[in-house]
Amino acid sequence: MAKRQLLMLGIRTSFHTIAAVLVAGLIFTAVFLSRNSLPKENPQSHGVTDRGGDSGRECNLFEGKWVFDNVSYPLYKEEDCKFMSDQLACEKFGRKDLSYKFWRWQPHTCDLPRFNGTKLLERLRNKRMVYVGDSLNRGQWVSMVCMVSSVITNPKAMYMHNNGSNLITFKALEYNATIDYYWAPLLVESNSDDPTNHRFPDRIVRIQSIEKHARHWTNSDIIVFNSYLWWRMPHIKSLWGSFEKLDGIYKEVEMVRVYEMALQTLSQWLEVHVNPNITKLFFMSMSPTHERAEEWGGILNQNCYGEASLIDKEGYTGRGSDPKMMRVLENVLDGLKNRGLNMQMINITQLSEYRKEGHPSIYRKQWGTVKENEISNPSSNADCIHWCLPGVPDVWNELLYAYILDHHSS
């Protein structure tokens, strides 16, 4: 009898154990399936609000079209921004066709978040944001300063400091928010580092030296890099040594290779000095030029001078951008991410390709005496590199704003 009771007890115990295991398995399976039924976040996604009705569909902020919008644009008035650069103030210097101010970027399947200067300043409260790079990045910095200063009603609550060095500072006092620009056109140390005296026939870089510049970015909360146009020559001299001493070793290196080396030097510095939990990193892709009108069906040997319309061919690419350099940048950023540090590329290249009419052309301050041939042939003096403000760089900053405020996730 006792043996039979023990046997029955063992059977019941085994049954309960098996049942418990089965229940646990069912619970685990249900949780696993429910987790995997959720939409997965793609780290490369550029999505915001999907307008297509399919919530699982990703949106790329950088694929879209320009829409004329003279109701909500421009985001500020050229004459109202006391920080405007004369190099970019096209209306002030005589441009009559002002339609370049009224174009809004519309992604194909979503909406770009509307820029809100107050929200950005709140996000930047007690923080520092710095743009690092060449004059294109300086133009984007001017754009951002104009965009945020337009919501500050007290002119005494903001100021700009420029003592002629590489660093220019904008401060919004009420928020203790700093938005800086730092001149470093090749990112690493070079013979073009002087903010005013930087044009030489030979471009020379110290490819492994970046600390001279980088110490000015340390402890920033947001860093926005760019570097493109200053590399555009077949070969660049690389210096092993210092500019002060005469015993340095110079070697001409193919441009794409030395560009990659500079980006790797930047990456190595960031890995050592940047806390990814504190600092957000961005890299603006290349800003295209429009110096050959024949590329978009215009007159041979002409450029952006006199252009008043956009390029309407979707996917248009001219020779003012370099796919090889773009691939190098993407590969370096991918490698950096694989090592645990994310630097988001803001891909402004394709959307800017369409805007051949957005450059200053001849409508800017002339820093020297205008030559006779430039008067008779204005296109020879046209700036088809930089951008009028308000204009294209405002959209670059709207894209940047979406990432800073994390309004880019699906």
Swiss-Prot record:
Localization, UniProt: Golgi apparatus membrane
Record's bilayer topology term: Single-pass type II membrane protein
Keyword Transmembrane assigned: yes
Motif (DCXHWCLPGXXDXWN motif): 383-397
One term under GO cellular component: Golgi apparatus
Keywords: Golgi apparatus, Membrane, Signal-anchor, Transmembrane, Transmembrane helix
Superkingdom, natural source: Eukaryota
Gene Ontology molecular function: any one: xylan O-acetyltransferase activity
Residues passing through the membrane, by range: 13-33
Main location as per UniProt: Golgi
BP term (GO), one: xylan biosynthetic process
Motif (GDS motif): 133-135
Function text: May act as a bridging protein that binds pectin and other cell wall polysaccharides. Probably involved in maintaining esterification of pectins. May be involved in the specific O-acetylation of cell wall polymers.
Extra facts: Contains 2 motifs that are conserved in esterases, but it is unlikely that this protein belongs to the catalytically active pectin esterases.
Family: Belongs to the PC-esterase family. TBL subfamily.
Protein name per UniProt: Protein trichome birefringence-like 34
The gene coding this protein: TBL34
